[in-house]
């Protein structure tokens, strides 16, 4: 049993806890504490009721500063200084750092100094962390000495397995990516000030270009592609699920069917449960609550001049990523 604490109980933190129970992994993980400055009543309410993912089907009760989920007691903390967190007293094996605010080595070291065994960040994190893991691609590189680990981003988890599969089958020279991402908490409900002038605009009324570090994230996991990928991103007026438009130049000449067959085959083996494939006429809402990191839409595959290939890949940017947090945390705990 892995003792975990969740630091930051926002979109990812709550989905991690939901995924833990909904997938039956509460026999693998024991959540000993949640740390968030939100009021306990708000924490319990937003765990029970979620606009994107519906009602949580497990019993939730609140008594003083203890959250009870399906009979399991979880301590609720509201401590803003990492150094003051009682991880040592609680016997925390791994902190799931889900604030999005603390993403560097110094923050991770503060968790370790407070008594945590290891830290898994729910963001790309700074380059000086011990490892960045995209589950299904490089989790076998984890060692017991690596205590500060990033789980990458939802978009890196979505696109890297597809690039990996295409490269294994045909060889990939280079590529470009457009991320079509659901709205996020850092956007405005109505026009309001933000340091990014595009994000001053109402999220529900526009398609909004935003900065992305996706290309750098790909290079961190697949260094052979350094300087060979570029990416842009837009946010669209939906609350969940992301589509990724991937275009790659291949080393081999291919047909649409050959590309789709390679991606169909990739859903087995190491990428089973990570990559999925569909040819149904689906739309974004159909992928809500899908636990895969990526779902290839074979109906949208295109080939130009036999070597330029375009694919469309879907993901639930919350639920898929939350499930990968649990996968990576387990491998971190088991690493020898």
UniProtKB/Swiss-Prot annotation:
Cite the binding residues for substrate: 153-155, 199, 212-213, 235
**Catalytic activities:** D-erythrose 4-phosphate + NAD(+) + H2O = 4-phospho-D-erythronate + NADH + 2 H(+)
Q: Name one Pfam family in it.
A: Gp_dh_N
Q: Where in the cell is it found?
A: Cytoplasm
Q: Give the superkingdom in one word.
A: Bacteria
Catalytic site positions: 154 (nucleophile)
Q: Which InterPro entries match?
A: E4P_DH_bac, GlycerAld/Erythrose_P_DH, GlycerAld_3-P_DH_cat, GlycerAld_3-P_DH_NAD(P)-bd, NAD(P)-bd_dom_sf
**GO:BP terms for this protein?**
pyridoxal phosphate biosynthetic process; pyridoxine biosynthetic process
Signal peptide positions are none
Positions of NAD(+) binding: 11-12, 317
The record's note on quaternary structure and interaction partners says: Homotetramer.
- Family per UniProt? Belongs to the glyceraldehyde-3-phosphate dehydrogenase family. Epd subfamily.
Role noted for this protein? Catalyzes the NAD-dependent conversion of D-erythrose 4-phosphate to 4-phosphoerythronate.
Give the protein's recorded name.
D-erythrose-4-phosphate dehydrogenase
Task: Give the species.
Answer: Alteromonas mediterranea (strain DSM 17117 / CIP 110805 / LMG 28347 / Deep ecotype)
């Amino acid at each position: 049993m892995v003792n975990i604490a969740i630091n930051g109980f926002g979109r990812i933190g709550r989905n991690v806890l939901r995924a833990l129970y909904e997938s039956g992994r509460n026999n693998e993980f024991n959540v000993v504490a949640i740390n968030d400055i939100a009021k306990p009543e708000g924490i319990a309410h937003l765990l029970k009721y979620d606009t994107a993912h519906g009602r949580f089907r497990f019993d939730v009760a609140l008594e003083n500063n203890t959250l009870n989920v399906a009979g399991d007691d979880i301590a609720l903390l509201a401590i803003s200084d990492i150094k003051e967190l009682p991880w040592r007293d609680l016997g925390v094996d791994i902190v799931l750092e889900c604030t999005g605010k603390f993403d560097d080595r110094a923050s991770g070291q503060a968790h370790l100094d407070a008594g945590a065994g290891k830290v898994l960040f729910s963001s790309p994190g700074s380059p000086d962390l011990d490892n960045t893991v995209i589950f299904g691609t490089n989790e076998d590189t984890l060692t017991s000495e690596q205590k500060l680990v990033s789980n990458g981003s939802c978009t890196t988890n979505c696109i890297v397995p597809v690039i990996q599969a295409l490269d294994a089958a045909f060889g990939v020279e280079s590529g470009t990516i457009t991320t079509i991402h659901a709205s996020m908490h850092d956007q405005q409900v109505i026009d309001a000030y933000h340091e990014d002038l595009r994000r001053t605009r109402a999220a529900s009324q526009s398609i909004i270009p935003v900065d992305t570090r996706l290309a750098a994230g790909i290079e961190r996991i697949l260094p052979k592609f350094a300087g060979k990928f570029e990416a842009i991103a837009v946010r669209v007026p939906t609350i969940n699920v992301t589509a990724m438009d991937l275009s790659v130049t291949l080393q081999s000449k291919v047909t649409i069917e050959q590309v789709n067959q390679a991606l169909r085959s990739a859903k087995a083996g190491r990428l089973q449960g990570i990559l999925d494939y569909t040819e149904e006429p689906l739309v974004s809402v159909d992928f809500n609550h899908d636990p895969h990191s990526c779902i290839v839409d074979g109906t949208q595959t295109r080939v130009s001049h036999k070597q330029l290939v375009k694919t469309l890949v879907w993901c639930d940017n919350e639920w898929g990523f939350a499930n990968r947090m649990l996968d990576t945390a387990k491998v971190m705990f088991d690493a020898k």
